[in-house]
Amino acid sequence: WVSTMPKIGILVFLLNLSFLATGYDIQWSTVVQDTIGNLYTPYAQPFQTLLLVCSVLSFVVGNIVGLSQYRIKRLLTFSTINHLGFMLLALAVSTEESVEGFVFYLVQYTLTNVNTFLTLLAFGYMTKGILQNKSNVREFVLLDDLKGQFYKNPLLVISFAVSLFSMAGIPPLMGFFAKQMVLYSVSYSYSYISIVAIITSVIGASYYLKIVQLMFFQKDSANTTIQTDSSEEVQQPLVTTMHSSVIAVLTLIISLYLFDSSILLNACHLLSLSLFSV
């Protein structure tokens, strides 16, 4: 949540700011509408251009630079930059369809991102377990630390792979439909940017597949046996029932979204319509 909630707050602020800049009558107070709205309306076109430029840069930087990363957190950071590109692209258009795509993308990104970090945290707990002395959690830092995890924690690896495939936009997972919704909403206005987004997403999918290849098809040659002194007591891994349940529920939502998508889609549609005044 520490890494996810600030991004959501900034994106929601940009959503409101994009409406003010483009002159849409959204549900703001009269004072705010008259002051901030009048301030940014003359800069509507430059603001939209800025969002489009930032979107394209996010696609290129997030996917191309991410290919050279070998640390897990840095790779996920550039992955986030790529996802922000899709949301900025939807904000730049500011139509009912694009806002609906923005809301849906934000929801699926939050679910997938939380599931990814919960799974990585569970990897650390499951690998080392709890010792009564210090440092009870092994932190996964490098991509090579994920080698052969399928042979140790198959269920966690499957959950992690589902999140990675969703972030890569592979059907029929939730991430695919989110990207499709955003690209469809902007395809008529900015088809060239849609092409850039598709090409860079295909390139960026390779580093997600690299992680899957490490977990499923390579064995860890390092000795991962926990060495303890006689005074140390190795207890059960610190993966609580709540932790496991949240991972299981999020994985099911991401993977089985296709079979019952009406609830989330209708909610996003109603929310986007509520932002526009008739």
For each feature predicted by the language model, list its residue ranges.
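Alpha-helical transmembrane segments of multi-pass membrane proteins predominantly involved
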Residues: 1-278
